[in-house]
């Protein structure tokens, strides 16, 4: 600790022996040793405390650095979240605008279609099928010579023609939903185990010979008992 060698200690001992004498030298050496031990313990304690303080300072610096990194990452995450919220709001606004524009177009197209359909119904009359026209023409050719005798029959045919033309107009119905009748679904392993009951256990007498040997031993006894009862 004090960088003292063996020669210095020997010289110090000789001087102490000359000054103190042989009677007081052991007590002085003991006292010097105690003081030396106390000083060494004090120095080691101070050194350990200084090292602990240095370690504590280093740990504080590291903790401050880590806290700064955490705060930086938190600020970056908040900025990214704000950007994501802004992009989501822009997407929602654009989506709402698109839906509004499509609804406006549909609302504008509905009165046009209704006006066009009404004008077409007023201008165009329904056309009867060719088979009906052919049958009607044949009937009319056959009834030409008898037109003076049967005017009421022609009136009935005209009424039938108008009724058929009225019924010939197709009626379009939009099917929005589909019924769930006659539709089958394939069950998976999980649904089978959950919904279907467990199959009954059927013992295999050929494979489980040792387990079912007592049944084979009971059969002859039961047969002998039955024979005795019959006799």
From Swiss-Prot:
One Pfam family recorded for the sequence: TatA_B_E
Q: Which intervals carry biased composition (Basic and acidic residues)?
A: 101-111
GO molecular function terms here?
A: protein transmembrane transporter activity
**Which Gene Ontology cellular component annotation is one that this UniProt entry carries?**
TAT protein transport complex
Any stretches that span the bilayer, and where are they?
1-21
User: What subcellular locations does the record give?
Assistant: Cell inner membrane
Q: Which InterPro entries match?
A: TatA/B/E, TatB
Show the ranges annotated as biased composition (Polar residues): 148-157
The record's keywords, sorted A to Z, are:
Cell inner membrane, Cell membrane, Membrane, Protein transport, Translocation, Transmembrane, Transmembrane helix, Transport
Q: Which residues form a coiled coil?
A: none
Which Gene3D superfamilies has this protein been placed in? 1.20.5.3310
Extract the ranges annotated as region (Disordered). 77-168
State its role: Part of the twin-arginine translocation (Tat) system that transports large folded proteins containing a characteristic twin-arginine motif in their signal peptide across membranes. Together with TatC, TatB is part of a receptor directly interacting with Tat signal peptides. TatB may form an oligomeric binding site that transiently accommodates folded Tat precursor proteins before their translocation.
Homology family: Belongs to the TatB family.
The name on file for this protein is Sec-independent protein translocase protein TatB
Higher taxonomy: Bacteria, Pseudomonadati, Pseudomonadota, Gammaproteobacteria, Moraxellales
């Amino acid at each position: 600790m004090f960088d003292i060698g063996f020669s210095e200690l020997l010289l110090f001992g000789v001087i102490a022996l000359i000054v103190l004498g042989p009677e007081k030298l052991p007590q002085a050496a003991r006292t010097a040793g105690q003081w030396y031990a106390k000083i060494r313990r004090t120095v080691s304690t101070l050194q350990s405390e200084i090292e602990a303080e240095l370690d504590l300072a280093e740990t504080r610096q590291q903790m401050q650095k880590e806290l700064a990194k955490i705060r930086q990452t938190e600020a970056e995450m908040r900025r990214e979240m704000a950007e994501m919220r802004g992009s989501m709001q822009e997407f929602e606004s654009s989506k709402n605008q698109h839906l509004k524009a499509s609804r406006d177009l549909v609302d504008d197209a509905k009165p046009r279609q209704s006006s066009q359909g009404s004008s077409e119904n007023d201008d165009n009359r329904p056309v009867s099928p060719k088979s009906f026209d052919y049958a009607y023409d044949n009937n009319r050719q056959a009834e030409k010579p008898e037109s003076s005798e049967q005017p009421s029959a022609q009136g009935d045919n005209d009424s039938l023609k108008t009724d058929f033309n009225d019924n010939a107009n197709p009626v379009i119905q939009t099917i929005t939903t589909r019924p769930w009748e006659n539709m089958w679904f394939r069950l998976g392993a999980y649904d089978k185990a959950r919904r279907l009951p467990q199959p009954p256990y059927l013992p295999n007498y050929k494979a489980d010979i040792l387990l079912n040997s007592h049944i084979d031993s009971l059969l002859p006894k039961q047969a002998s008992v039955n024979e005795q009862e019959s006799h």
